[in-house]
Amino acid sequence: MRLVRAAGLTMTVLALAGAAAPPGIVGSGAVAVAFRMSDPRITESSGLAISRSRPGLAYTVNDSGDGPYVYAIDMGTGAVVGVTALAGVEAVDFEAMGTGPDATLLVADIGDNDADRDVVRVHVIDEPRRGSVAVEPRSVELTYPDGPHDAEAVLTVGDRLVVVTKEFVGAGFYAAPVFTEDSGTAFVLRRVGDAPAVVTDATVLDDGRVVVRDYGRGYVVRPDGWRQVGRFRLPRMPQGETIAAADIGQVVYAGSEGTDSAVYRLRVPGPGADGETGRRPGERSTAASGHTDVPAATPPSTPPSTGSGTAQLAPWLMAGGVLALIAAAAAVRRRRW
């Protein structure tokens, strides 16, 4: 992913902060490597989806720099068993995938690091089979009501396509009725809720709950009001970019960019595991709320930290310091102009 310097530095610090979770997030639960994307063609897996109609297949796309290709992955071996080319499509910045109605697949060209794309696109195709083929997708043009946004997450809720923007402040869920019977090809998105900061992917569980992720955690959200009802820690990854729900059950697969990247399988805590306090994403929990973070999922090789309170807080203090430096630098630059 191509990031501006300041954002890249900030995300690096936030990732370090996430490596030592604050008190209240306790590591437990089984996590396993489901498969590895070892094919040399997959270098920047930025989207992941699990097939609903073809058992044992997953799909991924590369970040910007590759062509308009969808790779079918055998989940038993991690091998690429099919490549689907999207005919007539220019891949600007593929950043997300999702599953749609009637065994369709969403390929979201919604990345916009510089926030200068007036229109972004989501391409809809039938879930590919094994083998190589070229298909002509249904391409949907999307416009934000409040100007361009960077985004790396797409999902469907009922007949609505939902995009989750990737921002440090003011991130949101934006929706459009893309899958109604009289659907067109161009839509103005509507903001329907607030999202956590720096979301890199999202998915929908079979019970209807939405799971979004950042570089270190997953957040459980109810789409009837877009309220955050839980969170859990994700396995440590070089650059965690993907999350996809299994075809059945409360299981998700989480992956990273990079060559030979591992895809982890983990279970999402069930409804009520944290009291379902109804907090909206970004709201702080308090003792009065009764909120308790859901049990975290961590790899067996990386047990949760048992260090002192000072050690637990150190990464967060470092993150705050770097953010302050970035803000100061920006202020100096404005004065020069």
Model-derived regions, located:
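Sequence/structural signature of beta-propeller domains
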Residues: 2-9, 18-337
